[in-house]
Structure formats: C-alpha cells, structure tokens
From Swiss-Prot:
InterPro entries assigned to the protein according to its UniProt record, in alphabetical order: ATP-grasp, ATP_grasp_subdomain_1, D-Ala_lig_Van_CS, D_ala_D_ala, Dala_Dala_lig_C, Dala_Dala_lig_N, PreATP-grasp_dom_sf
Gene Ontology molecular-function annotations: ATP binding; D-alanine-D-alanine ligase activity; metal ion binding
Binding-site list for ATP: 154-209
SUPFAM superfamilies: Glutathione synthetase ATP-binding domain-like (SSF56059), PreATP-grasp domain (SSF52440)
Cofactor: Mg(2+); Mn(2+)
Matching Pfam families: Dala_Dala_lig_C, Dala_Dala_lig_N
Compartment list: Cytoplasm
Name of the protein in its database record: D-alanine--D-alanine ligase
UniProt cross-references to PROSITE patterns, sorted A to Z: ATP_GRASP, DALA_DALA_LIGASE_1, DALA_DALA_LIGASE_2
Length: 337
C-alpha cells in the first residue's frame, strides 16, 4: 500500500506563528508513529513564503504539488494537508478557501465555519441563534467618540468589562478594563488589531473547556477540563505560553456535578453541529458560582503544544491521537474516491 503524501503546513502570518510551530511538532511526532504517511513539513512565514524544514524555498501550486525553487528537485505531489496554523490564515478560513479551490482535501473545519468562529461578533450571534447562553456584549465598528461613550456606558452598567479585538486568537488584543479613564486608550489598542471590537461583561467564573471531535463517524465531547489562573489575572497570551505562567490545567475539572457536566457537553455538541464544525474543536465555557453556563468561544484549530488541553482531553477520553488522525484522514480520502 502506497503512503499518503501529507503536507504539514504550519506558521502563518499572525501573532500565534510560533505557537503554530509548537503545535506542528506534536502533529509531526504523532504522524511519525504511523507508517501510512509520508510527511513534508512546510512553514509559511509571516511574509507568505513557503519553506521546508530543510530550508528549501517552495510553493504550493494549483496542481496540488509542492514545487521547489531549486528546479533540480522534483515536485512533491500532495494528497492531503493539515493546516496547523493558529490565527491568520488558518483559523480565519482563508487558506481553506484556497484548498477548496484547488480541490485539495484538508484536516479541520471548513472555510465558513472557521471564519464564523474566529470572528467573536459573528460567533456570538450564532450562539444566540442556536439558543446557547453566552456573555452579554456590545460590538463596535469604528474608533470614535461614540464608541468610547458606548464602552464607558457598558463599564458603568457592568462594573467591569473586557475589550477584545473581534478577529484575534490566544487573547491577543484582549484587555480587562475596570477604570473608565482607560477605556479610550484600550479601545484604540484593540482597534489596532482588528476592524471590529467586542465589549463583553466580565464574568467571574470558572473557565472550562471541552474537546469536541469526530471519531469513527461519531461526534465526541469530552468531560470538561479547567484552566485555573492566578486570581488577579485572566488567561492572557503570556499566561498560556510563558514559562513563568502560574496558570495550571486540570484535564477533568473538579467539583462539577454530573448534571452540569452533561449540560456543558450537550451545549458543546449543539454548537459543533449547529456551526457545521468538522474533525476537531475546543469549545470554552464559563461556569459561574450560581451554576450558570455561558459559552465563551470556539477554537477551530486548538493548540497542540505540551501544555495544550485538546490532545490531553482526547487521550484522557481513551483515544490515541495518532489513531484519531489516521481515522479522520483515511475516512475523508475514502469518501473522496
């Protein structure tokens, strides 16, 4: 049986570029455990240049092959691609549109689902339309006096707010604000990351995460895990990835009743189905002291770094990551044939 030529594409043009490389390491080591795949790792740098791990400049062509700048190297035909890219152009849905155009099968959510989840405003509209509770919010489309006034009113009404760039991941462009004198500058900073900004009510709650993925034709939702941060912080980019981070994770959250856990999992599956997600996702919730469940966000290509929750929760659920990848890829390629 011939091997599947699998392109592991990583990097991208966002602030999460280096995190994507870390996740790609996990995918690469997992794929290496199977003899089904011939893997070519290619990094997409921040300027849009493709480069192999060996340092060869190359490009992905419309003929579904990697063509090298060094013309003495034969083109490498691509059967399948894993776009291990956090942020732009992976989770935004942009690169999936290109794969669709050239009819190249790929791992993960499709273009529209990726785009809808990455934009926090669009995502919250979908959550509400699906009847899934989420945090109170307003959204702003430009930085001006009216936007500042609206954000200050939200702060006065809610006591504390988060101002977030609508189209960023890993808490990039995300700020907690308790002082009205800081609203204008923070709002300006957030608009520096995205053309739209969402202002959310600060929720004092536990942060729970569910891995939701497809396995043997079934949609699986794991037991909720938990992110536990220092009481004076929220889960910032640095808290997620810095070596000095004080945050810790529990693969299975403690002291969550069976009833609450099942309701969270039901909401997660409802969101996965309703938003037409595919293959994998990490769906994040708040659980308040009053046991109110609020959907926070959906990550359509969750991190797979040494500290990431998705692979840990999948494995804790009894599934092997290499076998999971093989099942998804083979099922997809068989359906294509």
């Amino acid at each position: 049986m011939s091997r599947i030529n699998l392109l592991l594409l990583c990097g991208g043009g966002s602030a999460e570029h280096d995190i994507s490389l870390m996740s790609a390491n996990y995918f690469e080591s997992s794929l290496a455990k199977s003899d089904q795949f011939s893997v070519l790792r290619v990094e997409l740098d921040k300027l849009g240049q493709y480069r192999t791990a060996a340092g060869d400049d190359c490009e992905l062509t419309n003929n579904r092959e990697i063509r090298f700048r060094d013309e003495t190297k034969a083109p490498w035909p691509v059967d399948y691609v894993i776009p291990c890219i956090h942020g732009y152009p992976g989770e935004t849905g942009d690169i999936q549109s290109y794969f669709n155009l050239i009819q190249l099968p790929y791992f993960g959510c499709e273009s529209e689902a990726s785009s809808n989840c990455f934009n926090k405003i669009t995502a919250k509209m979908w959550f509400s339309a699906l009847g899934i509770p989420n945090t109170p919010y307003i959204f702003l489309h430009q930085y001006d006096d009216e936007a500042i006034s609206q954000a200050q009113t939200a702060l006065a009404n809610w006591g504390s707010i988060f101002i977030k760039a609508a189209s960023q991941g890993s808490s990039v462009g995300c700020y907690k604000v308790d002082d009205s004198s800081k609203v204008a500058q923070v709002l300006k900073d957030a608009f520096g990351y995205a053309p739209y900004v969402v202002v959310e009510k600060t929720i004092k709650a536990r942060e729970l995460e569910v891995a939701v993925y497809e396995y043997n034709g079934e949609i699986v939702a794991t037991l909720p895990g938990e992110i536990i941060c220092d009481t004076n912080t929220f889960y910032t980019f640095d808290e997620k990835y810095a070596k000095s981070s004080k945050a810790r994770t529990d693969v299975v959250a403690k002291d969550v009743s069976v009833e609450l856990s099942e309701q969270i999992r039901a909401y997660a599956i409802k969101a996965f189905k309703g938003m037409k997600l595919r293959h994998l996702s990490r769906i994040d919730f708040f659980l308040t002291a009053e046991n109110e469940i609020l959907l926070n966000e959906i990550n359509t290509f969750p991190g797979s770094t040494p500290i990431s929750m998705f692979p840990k929760m999948l494995q804790n659920h009894g599934h092997d990551f290499t076998e999971y990848l093989s099942l998804v890829i083979n099922s997809q390629l068989s359906a294509k044939d």
